[in-house]
């Protein structure tokens, strides 16, 4: 991936984290990599564990970032979340949800989609 694209991705993820922390969520870990995929942000929202996918698109011509979280991507996120929970058994009993932060435009405008999908939808 080109350096400029990596920088953009890191900046958008940092902005998404700041947005969520302003809303009261607390970071557990960022960029957790597993064989099946990556978890951009893992956060706590009260008693819930939240797996956050951050997607950036320059424009929403093809549906924007949220539209790019298709069933294949959702399945990878669920698998990565299962691996994360297996590696962190103290968190495994918590209720979980999957959120998406959709970023688009220049400068990016962020939209937080709580409970964007459920693990049993995949």
Curated annotation (Swiss-Prot):
InterPro entries: Restrct_endonuc-II-like (IPR011335), tRNA_endonuc-like_dom_sf (IPR011856), UPF0102_YraN-like (IPR003509). Pfam families: UPF0102 (PF02021). Gene3D superfamilies: 3.40.1350.10. GO terms for molecular function: nucleic acid binding. It comes from the Bacteria. HAMAP family: UPF0102. Belongs to the UPF0102 family. NCBIfam families: PRK12497.1-3, YraN family protein. PANTHER family: UPF0102 PROTEIN YRAN. This is UPF0102 protein XCV0816. It comes from Xanthomonas euvesicatoria pv. vesicatoria (strain 85-10).
């Amino acid at each position: 991936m080109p350096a400029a694209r990596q920088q953009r991705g890191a900046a958008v993820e940092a902005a998404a984290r700041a947005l969520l922390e302003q809303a009261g969520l607390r970071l557990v870990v960022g960029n957790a990599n597993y064989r099946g995929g990556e978890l951009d942000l893992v956060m706590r929202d009260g008693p819930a564990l939240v797996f956050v996918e951050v997607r950036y698109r320059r424009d929403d011509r093809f549906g924007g970032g949220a539209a790019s979280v298709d069933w294949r991507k959702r399945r990878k996120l669920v698998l990565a979340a299962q691996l994360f929970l297996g590696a962190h058994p103290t968190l495994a009993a918590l209720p979980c949800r999957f959120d998406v932060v959709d970023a688009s435009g220049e400068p990016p405008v962020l939209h937080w989609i709580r409970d964007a999908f459920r693990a049993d939808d995949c």
